[in-house]
């Protein structure tokens, strides 16, 4: 049997010094034979999705210790993408994912912890912790802070549900008065929790359920609801059980790589496609699979996207539906249940809470279980009062949303669309692929031919859109914003938001080697690979060039002759050391960002680190 890792620091005469230090943290003689379990928290007062996590690490710790373990808490950083959006702060968002993964590895390996409970929530924190979990391959349970309640506001005589993106859209819409914009701003984010739509944070927290690494409801129980407390407590108990199964019984299904297998990653991607998740999830699933040594690529995502239907549309794809509505319809377990009935997932995969996903669905899918516990659990509703306090309300819906024909979650027989909510496009403009969230694209522009309007940065694009340079029928091309070229692969939420506010949301396309916020909708195509900064064809596009986007055939083509492109490439190479860098863009980069750019890879590889790029030959 594998020895407990922690015994490296707790056993033997030569570890007297280490034990002395452990004792100074509160450990006693009887603790030195117990598993030491790291509680990786991500509390910060900068991020509404994390502002309520301060005491939750100790809540988990108490359950770990009651179950026979020793809990030791530490914190990672957390960047708020919404606050970092639209300025130089966004350069740090994606790099923070790697920093979070490394920080978890550093703490866990430096102190020889036996297992981890990952308390995550927002955009890069769950992916960073997931990468660390797959890299370390020791027992782990994920529990997130939970979604924010949707805002409610009365504007122009109508009550409407809203979220962060609504505030951004109306701020650039001159038809709204300053007073109306202020009212929406104040109502958009009423509580603690991750932003209320199917944006990146909530998408990733849903995907940990599909991977089998978190408990049912992790992706959908509101941060404010009393029911969420049970998830934190159960996580503490489950991780001790996983420890015992691995270290005392050598049960490999207690490990992340034994649970989050290739089949589980396919399950997670199928869920993502079915629920129209954020395009960022593609980036993060590729990275997590890479850390676990799992062969999972854009080709696999393309294959899945061609036969998994769209079973749910949530904001931003459907502005009046939010995570609280998904939960009422049965949450992730209900979507997985519909996919399983359609033969679209492998339900034989293990989870941290059940021997197989199939057994978990039998208990938690409200479409097949009569369990009063499950039905009551998914009736957890918003409290409707602004708060930053976790578990502070216990409201219930009077009834569940069990309508699989017209409800928030549909059956395979009654999908929103037969094609899923995400698609991978290939073509000369993106030989290694690019991503579009089809759930947010108007059917009238699924095939779109337009002329390029090229910008060398997000800032330039924003100025061009707001300044009236962009016209209907154009393809806005924003380049040199990839992982290397940015660096940091900024989110393009402001350009897409401003296109929408200018009435161009269904009249223009946007193509970039950067990425998009989970709040993006419209014909927004990101992750173009290879990126401009590594010599990708997107660097050769000129304003006026015709571009064909054909989602039904999964194609994206720059309609310029090979001879013209070859001449442009020669001209680019003639720039010498300045080749494949933007013109007329000055961006001061710190050593931290330059180091990230030197080691990162393109989006088709998940923007993972490849140190061979800087190693001596």
Swiss-Prot record:
**Binding sites annotated in the UniProt record for [2Fe-2S] cluster:** 122, 195
| GO BP term, example | isoleucine biosynthetic process
* Any GO molecular function: magnesium ion binding
State the pathway, as annotated in the record: Amino-acid biosynthesis; L-isoleucine biosynthesis; L-isoleucine from 2-oxobutanoate: step 3/4; Amino-acid biosynthesis; L-valine biosynthesis; L-valine from pyruvate: step 3/4
Instruction: State the InterPro entries in the record.
Output: Dihydro-acid_dehy_C, DihydroxyA_deHydtase, DiOHA_6PGluconate_deHydtase_CS, ILV_EDD_C, ILV_EDD_N, IlvD/EDD_N
Which cofactor does the UniProt annotation name? [2Fe-2S] cluster; Mg(2+)
Q: Which reaction does it catalyse?
A: (2R)-2,3-dihydroxy-3-methylbutanoate = 3-methyl-2-oxobutanoate + H2O; (2R,3R)-2,3-dihydroxy-3-methylpentanoate = (S)-3-methyl-2-oxopentanoate + H2O
The answer to whether UniProt assigns keyword Ribosomal protein to this entry is: no
Q: Which residues are involved in binding Mg(2+)?
A: 81, 123-124, 491
Q: Name one Pfam family in it.
A: ILVD_EDD_N
Q: What does this protein do?
A: Functions in the biosynthesis of branched-chain amino acids. Catalyzes the dehydration of (2R,3R)-2,3-dihydroxy-3-methylpentanoate (2,3-dihydroxy-3-methylvalerate) into 2-oxo-3-methylpentanoate (2-oxo-3-methylvalerate) and of (2R)-2,3-dihydroxy-3-methylbutanoate (2,3-dihydroxyisovalerate) into 2-oxo-3-methylbutanoate (2-oxoisovalerate), the penultimate precursor to L-isoleucine and L-valine, respectively.
**Family to which this protein belongs:** Belongs to the IlvD/Edd family.
Subunit: Homodimer.
Q: What is this protein called?
A: Dihydroxy-acid dehydratase
Query: What is the gene called?
Result: ilvD
């Amino acid at each position: 049997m594998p020895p407990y890792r922690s015994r490296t620091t707790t056993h033997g005469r030569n570890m007297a010094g280490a034990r002395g230090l452990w004792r100074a943290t509160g450990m006693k003689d009887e603790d030195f034979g117990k598993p030491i379990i790291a509680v990786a928290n991500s509390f910060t007062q900068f991020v509404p999705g994390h502002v309520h996590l301060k005491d939750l690490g100790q809540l988990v710790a108490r359950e770990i210790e009651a179950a026979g373990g020793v809990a030791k808490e530490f914190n990672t950083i957390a960047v708020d993408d919404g606050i970092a959006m639209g300025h130089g702060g966004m350069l740090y968002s994606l790099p923070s994912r790697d920093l979070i993964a490394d920080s978890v590895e550093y703490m866990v390996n430096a102190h020889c912890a036996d297992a981890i409970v990952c308390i995550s929530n927002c955009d890069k924190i769950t992916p960073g912790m997931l990468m660390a979990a797959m890299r370390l391959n020791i027992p782990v349970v994920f529990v997130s802070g939970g979604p924010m309640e949707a805002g409610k506001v009365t504007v122009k005589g109508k009550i409407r549900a809203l979220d962060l993106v609504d505030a951004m859209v109306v701020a650039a819409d001159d038809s709204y008065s300053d007073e109306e914009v202020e009212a929406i701003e104040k109502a958009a984010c009423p509580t603690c929790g991750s932003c209320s739509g199917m944006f990146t944070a909530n998408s990733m927290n849903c995907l940990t359920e599909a991977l089998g690494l978190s408990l049912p409801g992790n992706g959908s129980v509101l941060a404010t609801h009393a029911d969420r407390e049970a998830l934190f407590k159960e996580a503490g108990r489950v991780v001790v059980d996983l420890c015992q199964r691995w270290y005392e019984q050598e049960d490999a299904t207690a490990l992340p790589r034994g649970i989050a297998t290739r089949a589980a990653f396919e399950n997670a991607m199928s869920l993502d496609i079915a629920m129209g998740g954020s395009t960022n999830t593609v980036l993060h699933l590729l990275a997590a699979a890479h850390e676990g040594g799992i062969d999972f690529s854009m080709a696999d995502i393309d294959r899945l996207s061609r036969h998994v239907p769209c079973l749910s549309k949530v904001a931003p794809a459907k502005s009046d539906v939010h995570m609280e509505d998904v939960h009422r319809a049965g949450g992730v377990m209900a979507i997985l249940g519909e996919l399983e009935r359609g033969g679209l997932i492998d339900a034989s995969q293990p989870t941290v809470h059940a021997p197989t996903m199939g057994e978990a669905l039998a208990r938690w899918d409200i479409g097949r279980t009569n369990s009063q516990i499950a039905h009551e659990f998914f009736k957890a509703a918003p409290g409707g009062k602004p708060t930053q306090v976790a578990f502070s309300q216990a409201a219930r819906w009077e009834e569940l949303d069990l309508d699989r024909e017209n409800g928030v979650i549909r059956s395979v027989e009654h999908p929103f669309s037969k094609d899923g909510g995400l698609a991978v496009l290939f073509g000369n403009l993106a030989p290694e692929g690019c991503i579009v969230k089809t759930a947010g694209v108007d059917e009238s522009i699924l095939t779109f031919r337009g002329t390029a309007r090229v910008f060398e940065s997000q800032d330039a694009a924003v100025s061009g859109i707001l300044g009236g340079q962009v016209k209907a029928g154009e393809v806005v091309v924003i380049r040199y914003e990839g992982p290397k070229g940015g660096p940091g692969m900024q989110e393009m939420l402001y350009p897409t938001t401003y296109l929408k506010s200018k009435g161009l949301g269904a009249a223009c396309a946007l193509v970039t080697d950067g990425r998009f916020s989970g709040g993006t909708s419209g014909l927004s195509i990101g992750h173009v690979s290879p990126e401009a900064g590594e010599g990708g064809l997107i660097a050769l596009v000129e304003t006026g060039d015709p571009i064909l986007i054909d989602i039904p055939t999964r194609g994206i083509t720059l309609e310029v002759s090979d001879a013209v492109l070859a001449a442009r490439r020669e001209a680019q190479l003639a720039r010498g050391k300045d080749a494949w860098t933007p013109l007329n863009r000055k961006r001061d980069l710190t050593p931290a960002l330059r180091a990230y750019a030197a080691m990162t890879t393109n989006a088709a590889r998940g923007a993972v680190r490849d140190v061979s790029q800087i190693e001596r030959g």
